[in-house]
């Protein structure tokens, strides 16, 4: 039993790594499925458009899904048209762009994975580049090749050119090599940029490593208990209403947060060293409905895993 609990605790502690690993495997599988089942290079002048659509359209869809499935996106935008101060609070107008940047970086993980896997495979890039009409690119690709290369490059992916099979294969391998080089460049650039942004965020943090670890734990526990409390109160309220409806009697008072309390608790959290509230709900409970003082020492240590609500 202790061994099972130890294994479970290990997987819970490594859930971010496991999640990204699962996302990577899912991306690889999806790309292979697209390549084998759906992708058929037309081997015509439409190669460029066809290849680029298959390369970038799934990445765009994954980016939109990343925004759509991120709870912080909805916390940021819900009610902003009615009350713009929600996203541009007085004294902290730049907070919106800071949080939006964090959401965007989080949403970019899946699209970058897709582009990396697709470029390493090389199928989409090979089709797209074989349809180029740019004289500069044609000169680069067809350098040292027969003159037919300039006119029949779009047929290379299908192997239907009038050139020798060895030349056709060389062109295909050359295009695939270019694609793989771009793929590794994208992976290295994304990894380095991720390291830089993480280091910058930690360097700018005004809380210690241990306090930040406690903050993450608190935020996760609060999220879990909040969901359970929602279910509990929703069950109690629905049970009371149904009972009163069928028994045709007036309901007893049911304690619920006020509209102002819901609004205050739904705001994005900003950390104040003087008060050390670890969530917006924590601040509302301690201070009532009074908003925290907007001092100049507000630090936006909004860790992605700590504030995904």
From Swiss-Prot:
Subcellular location: Membrane
Cellular component terms per the entry's GO annotation: plasma membrane
Cytoplasmic compartment residues: 1-15, 71-99, 201-309
Tagged with keyword Disulfide bond: yes
Extracellular side: 38-45, 130-174
Pfam families: Ca_hom_mod
Binding positions (a 1,2-diacyl-sn-glycero-3-phosphate): 15, 32, 37, 102, 121, 202
Known partners and oligomeric status: Oligomerizes to form undecameric cone-shaped channels.
Protein function: May assemble to form large pore channels with gating and ion conductance likely regulated by membrane lipids.
Protein's recorded name: Calcium homeostasis modulator protein 5
Source organism of the structure: Homo sapiens (Human)
